[in-house]
Amino acid sequence: MQTFKTLTMKKSLFIGALIAMAGLSFQSCEKLSSINENPNEPSNVDAGVLFTEGVRSSVSTSVTQSYLLGNVASQLAAKTLRAVIGEYSWNAFPNTWNQNYASLGNIIEAERVAAEAGNAQMEGAAKVMKSWVFSTLTLAYGDIPYTEAITGSTDAEWFPAYDTQEEIITGTNGLLEELARAVQLLDNGGSIQGDILFNGDAAKWKKLANAMRLRLLMYISEKQNVSAEFAAIVASESLMESNADNGILTYTGNFPNEYPLVPLKQGDFDAVAISTNAHAALDSLNDPRMYVYARPNNASTVFADPSIPATYDGADNGSTAISASCDKNGSRLGYAYYNYPGHDQAGTMAEGIIMTYAEQQFLLAEAAHNGWITDDAGTHHASGVQASLEYYGADFGMTGWTDFADYIANSGAGYDNSINSIREQKWLAMFFTGLDNYFEVRRWYTQESGNWANLPFISAPCSNTNGDVLPMRFLYPGNEASLNPDNYFNAIVVMGGNTQNTKMWVVDL
């Protein structure tokens, strides 16, 4: 992979934007290195150009991560080939590390340029994106370069120390503090240039920042008492009010704003199917999201004659290379995610999800269930379910429901005073939500002390190689040992190892 000197720092912070402006693309570490050394490159790039490229690249990375990793690790989908995720034979997944740090280069430089120009709103929006990308990295790997990745001092530029996950999330200048600062900045003057997410709407950026704060607080709630801080945000800060506030990137269908899965060959795209567990959950609820998440097994027949009922099934998580008992014949992913012959809407309709109103509502439902806030858990839960169904354009008529009220009252999707009723609907709503669907499943699994039976909507993958234990993290990329050896090996000592079962701070209960 690329030798990006572990991180994208001051000298190369704006390389992604420069390449985009030149009509080039990220192809190799050698190309990046040669550009980094170009003495004729401009010393200043417009913050809006940097921000556009940082948002686009980070969201597109998130889409790809969810397709290959998050959906599968959370058991919403299953790999039918090269099933290392489902069989629990995890590695570094270096693209997650490399591409996220590359995106951070543009985002951090946009933040710096905006701060120097006194553009508070631009700086605030960049902080939101920076916090989101760093949260993905630390929740995937554990301890990572953070403080020195931000400062970009001469030594740290090439050999950044690893911060502990606790410091990254909760410390001074940590993610929670940065998001709080972002909210304050977004209340001030300036403008958000190059904003392909919210078209310069600072109020929407504030709502996203506050929703992210709730998400992070929930992730660390087994390590710290976060109830008061969570309640204070709910009581006094602006939050998402509907799907109109969703943190999503809409693609145009044309390069470079093309949904990242569209260029795949169909055979490669079809190596992922809806999972047995997701199919079972949707089928038992008679849930119309089935028709969005999955493509019918008899798609060609249904396409020719829509009166013929569509049929669906799921593929098992696990490996057929170990045991033939793993069924890999599930329905492939739906038309919304790929331009199948005769169905080319993915190019212009697919979106990259950072965070949705539905997820926020499930966070509020869980907080109410826990007694952190005085709101009604069932109301927030129903709002989350409805928001997810509406986002995916649910057609209740296709499944026999009169409307949402009929569905929520009679399908079994409603809140039944149990935490699992919230968990299951949140899980179904987080399809293609980066790696956060896996982070949530990992949190629930840890809360239940690794007892799969206490999470009835998922299960240990068949023929897995890890003793039915859900992996806790991705391994550090192998080239870290040669690029940043002292800090890399020190991080492994502090973390207690570099295996898929090493417990990072948030899950070390």
Language model regions located:
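Short capping/connector residues at structural and topological boundaries
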Residues: 37-40, 149-151, 245, 295, ...
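Structured, solvent-exposed acidic/aromatic patches
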Residues: 45-48, 75-129, 133-394, 415-419, ...
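C-terminal functional modules
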Residues: 389, 393-509
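Short acidic (Asp/Glu) and glycine-rich catalytic loops that position anionic groups and cofactors
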Residues: 30-33, 341, 399-404
